[in-house]
């Protein structure tokens, strides 16, 4: 099944690859929280649904064990009664017991507890996505910042087919808000597949407003009576974009409010691991059947375009240590206007000054900055080649070694 079957954009195949792997899923996806030890090893819960309360179930996961979190917490809608259409038919709204809290203070305490537990299990370079409506997302955002998470973006999910405002007393509520945050301000190494998102968006930067329909049709899970299995089932395309943007094949995706299993189904299809937490048995049953029916995509279909920033860093000394350049080699720019000599310590010298390939490249041109990898060239069989070609050789060796 092609990724475009439920993505509104195509995955662009690039020449730089993120390693993929074949993931084996357990025959039984369900684990009981109380039967797992505190901070259980990864093998005890990976690619499974943990049945239990969100916070207590999170205690079963070890520190820094997940790469990305997607959380769709209770909205705390405060409906105050049934909703009816103009024809007096009742609107299927969220009125389940799990969405009811006695006060804002109780909701804030609940939010703080699960966010603290999530922060413990999130890797230092991991990120968290939280989705909500105007009823709860601002309260959740406050807790995120108070606990030290660092906000990266807020994303507006614009719904192509939102529910009307039947009473005509407010604007039609046509969007939900996602908050994307790193574990803390120091979390600089988080995954963001910028080039893949740009390529998927007709080579234009992906914006922070996303247009998707709400979950309908054959994707919407129904019970034997034709009723919705879960009132807030999210579209697979939304989860797919999140995972394609902020994770790599083989990463672990945590969903502490698993519901009908959209996160697990998309993770399996996209070659990611998952762990879900859910306490309601009907949702667990639906999610289990759904995930078991998913066929993962192949490695070629999961190739993600990456850019220079996503590639492993290579020091200039590594080029010398590999024997690709020797001390005393003369480098020049592509027009042979400037020259510098390679020294044994990995620096260059030119005009009586020594420094890095970048610093000396800038100095000889009278610039403040320079990319030495593309500026400096070496000569091979009478042909000038950028030293970046040597860096590429090192990166290929690193990839072959699994680095």
UniProtKB/Swiss-Prot annotation:
Annotated signal peptide: none
Could you tell me which Pfam families the record lists for this protein? Answer: N6_N4_Mtase, RAMA
The catalysed reaction is: a 2'-deoxyadenosine in DNA + S-adenosyl-L-methionine = an N(6)-methyl-2'-deoxyadenosine in DNA + S-adenosyl-L-homocysteine + H(+)
Taxonomic superkingdom: Bacteria
Tell whether Ligase is among the UniProt keywords: no
- Enzyme Commission (EC) number: 2.1.1.72
Gene for this chain: ccrM
Regarding protein family, the annotation reads: Belongs to the N(4)/N(6)-methyltransferase family.
Q: What is this protein called?
A: DNA methyltransferase CcrM
Q: Could you tell me which PROSITE patterns the record lists for this protein?
A: N6_MTASE (PS00092)
Where does the record place the RAMA domain?
297-399
């Amino acid at each position: 099944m092609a990724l475009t079957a439920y993505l509104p954009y195509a995955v662009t195949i690039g020449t730089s690859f993120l390693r993929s792997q074949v993931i084996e899923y357990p025959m039984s996806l369900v684990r009981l929280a109380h039967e797992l030890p505190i901070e259980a090893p990864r093998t005890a819960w990976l690619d499974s649904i943990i049945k239990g309360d969100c916070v207590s179930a999170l205690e079963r996961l070890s520190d820094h064990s997940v790469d990305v979190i997607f959380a769709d917490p209770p909205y705390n809608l405060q409906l105050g009664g049934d909703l009816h259409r103009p024809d007096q038919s009742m609107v299927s709204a969220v009125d389940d017991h799990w969405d009811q809290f006695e006060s804002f203070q109780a909701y804030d305490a609940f939010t703080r507890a699960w966010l603290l537990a999530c922060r413990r299990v999130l890797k230092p370079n991991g990120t968290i996505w939280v989705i909500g409506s105007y009823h709860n997302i601002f309260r959740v955002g406050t807790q995120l910042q108070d606990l030290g998470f660092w906000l990266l973006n807020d994303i507006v999910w614009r719904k192509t087919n939102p529910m009307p405002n039947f009473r005509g007393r407010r604007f039609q509520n046509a969007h939900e808000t996602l908050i994307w945050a790193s574990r803390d301000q120091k979390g600089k190494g988080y995954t963001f597949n910028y080039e893949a998102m740009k390529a998927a968006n007709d080579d234009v930067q992906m914006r922070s407003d996303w247009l998707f329909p709400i979950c309908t049709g054959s994707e919407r899970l129904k019970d034997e009576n034709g009723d919705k299995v879960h009132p807030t089932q999210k579209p697979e395309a939304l989860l797919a974009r999140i995972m394609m943007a902020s994770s790599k094949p083989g990463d672990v995706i945590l969903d502490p409010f698993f519901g009908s299993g959209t996160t697990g189904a998309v993770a399996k299809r996209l070659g990611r691991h998952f762990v879900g937490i859910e306490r309601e048995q009907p949702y667990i049953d639906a999610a289990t059947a759904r995930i078991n029916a998913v066929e993962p995509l192949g490695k070629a279909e999961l190739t993600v375009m990456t850019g220079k920033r996503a590639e492993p860093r290579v020091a200039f000394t590594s080029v010398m240590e590999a024997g690709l350049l020797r001390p005393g080699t003369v480098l020049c720019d592509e027009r042979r206007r400037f020259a510098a000599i390679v020294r044994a310590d990995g620096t260059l010298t030119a005009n009586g000054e020594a420094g890095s390939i970048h610093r000396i490249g800038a100095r000889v041109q009278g610039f403040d900055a320079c990319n030495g990898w593309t500026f400096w060239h070496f000569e091979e069989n009478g042909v000038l080649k950028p030293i970046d070609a040597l860096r590429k050789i090192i990166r290929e060796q690193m990839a072959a070694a699994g680095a």
